[in-house]
Amino acid sequence: MGSKTREKKMTSRPYTGNTDGNHPTERPGTKRFVEFMEYLFGMKSLGIYANRPMRGSASLSVHATWRAVDLKGKGTAKQNADARKAMVEFLFAHRDILGIEEIHAYDGVGCPIPNLTKFGGGYRCDRDSWKAWTPQKNAGTPGGDWTHVEIAPNMADSVTAIEKAFAKIFG
């Protein structure tokens, strides 16, 4: 959202995290969501599924659930940042209808918190707000030039749910 726009508070929703466990088969809604990000914002997927622990933790990564994707814009560093900023602002504005559970802005691109450090910031649905990351509490890749997005299980499992959500947004 632009700097002159107040953050519209939505309803906080439960955060799934990795509670659905390793899911080694593709979730078609996640793939369709990525296709929309590629089409709308010129993103490229850096990966969805990876059965591995989170960075700096023994806990399972949400990538193992087939509900998380890392996205990067194409082109120059500026083009990448501009595309990610537009995408993050869009995802945040439509977070409820799209079932967005978490957004990691490793380098702060698109995050509405001013004066972030190199650790960036993140959005989570259960607090329905952004949080500035610190050297002690961050997502493990400070300054990363990509964006991590997690969607809800019902969206990840359904192409129809994803398509209906985007149809409602662009109605």
Where are these regions (language model features)?
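C-terminal partner/receptor-binding element of secreted or periplasmic proteins
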Residues: 142-166
